[in-house]
A protein has these predicted regions:
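Glycine-rich, basic loop-to-helix element that forms the pyrophosphate-binding segment
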Residues: 83-100, 110
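Conserved nucleotide-sugar donor-binding catalytic segment
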Residues: 98, 137, 152-235
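Short aromatic/hydrophobic "clamp" motif used to bind/position activated sugar donors
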Residues: 105
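Short, acidic, metal-binding catalytic loop of nucleotide-sugar glycosyltransferases
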Residues: 41-50
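A conserved acidic beta->alpha catalytic loop
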Residues: 49, 57-66, 85, 109
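Acidic helix N-cap motif at the loop->helix transition within catalytic regions
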Residues: 35-37, 62-70, 117
Length: 317
């Protein structure tokens, strides 16, 4: 069956045609064979059927290529692309998005799972809310065996000024991708956060308070503490780049973002940059800035919940 030419497909993202909008799901993977089947099966098991799954193999050396080939044979909606050298997550995302034909786009990880109605619920939301560019949903945290650990509700988009408020379950219109372009390959492990900051400057982002996604917390997670410094560094780079322009965020949220930057500057010994960031926070919202710093000082004296910064909606400090 010949593939549809993406340049000739009509945009049905506003629900103006009887043909259901096509949803493109990009799934990048690198040596992810342990949980890859579960991730793919959660896509195949969606109640919404008008989707394509683009598997991007970032030069895996385990059983990942065999698993991908198996699913490409099983379902013609599944396609695959392989990098001949490892290019890391942001470039794998860009490779998948460049091949996507959908009216709506999303991506998922090789160790996480969609709930069965995830794509249907988010697609319906975008169809019913034409002014919204990105919808994002509640998640739950699961362990390496798939057991429930705790909830991760979607946060107000205004909080992007200091935290990745969107979490790991989202859907956006093709117009968002066409406006923003690809993910920043220089911000590995914070590429999604920077993308949402860009999106928030241009589009309406709306939470959908239904649990539609299972985020797995395990020893092989990219967001485990071994990558903590890289995540914090790149997230701060993204935040400093966009924070001055987040006029839609509440003043107290922008102030908190500047205090996060100040705290990270202190951690790396850059007291001049810390003072500048904190002064900006005080100018933006004096009261919340002072109370936030006091609370963070108290937290520093208490045991930290393991990995809390690295989870969906985790704060970058």
């Amino acid at each position: 069956v010949p593939e549809t030419d993406p340049t000739t497909r009509k945009d049905h993202s506003n629900g103006t045609s009887e043909q259901p909008p096509l949803v493109s799901i990009v799934l990048p993977t690198y040596n992810g064979s342990k949980y890859l089947r579960e991730a793919i099966e959660s896509c195949l098991g969606q109640t919404y059927q008008a989707w394509e799954l683009i598997l991007v193999d970032d030069c895996s050396s385990d059983e990942t290529p065999d698993i991908i080939a198996e699913y490409c044979r099983r379902d013609r909606r599944v396609r695959s692309i392989r990098h001949e050298v490892n290019k890391k997550l942001p470039q794998a995302l860009n490779t998948g998005h460049a091949a996507a034909r959908g009216d709506y786009l999303t991506w998922t990880s090789d160790d996480n799972r969609y709930r069965p109605a995830a794509i249907e619920e988010m697609t319906r939301f975008l169809q019913e809310h034409p002014a919204v560019g990105v919808v994002y949903a509640d998640c739950v945290l699961i362990d390496d065996t798939g057991r429930y650990m705790r909830d991760f509700p979607a946060l107000p988009a205004s909080r992007l000024a200091y935290v990745d408020a969107l979490g790991a379950c989202f859907l956006y219109r093709r117009s968002v991708y066409e406006t923003l372009g690809g993910y920043d390959v220089e911000l590995f492990l914070a590429e999604d956060y920077e993308y949402w900051l860009r999106a928030y400057r241009e589009f309406e982002l709306a939470p959908l308070h239904k649990v539609l996604y299972e985020y797995r917390w395990h020893t092989g997670s990219l967001t485990k503490s071994a990558n903590r410094r890289a995540i914090r560094t790149n997230a701060e780079r993204a935040l400093r780049r966009h924070l001055p322009y987040l006029r839609r965020s509440l003043p107290q949220d922008r102030a908190r973002g500047w205090t996060v930057c100040a705290a990270n500057a202190v951690r790396r010994g850059d007291l001049v940059q810390a003072a500048t960031a904190y002064a900006t926070a005080l100018r933006t919202a004096p009261g919340p800035s002072l109370s936030y710093v006091a609370r963070k000082l108290v937290e520093r004296l208490q045991p930290r919940r393991a990995g809390s910064e690295m989870l969906p909606n985790g704060e970058w400090s």
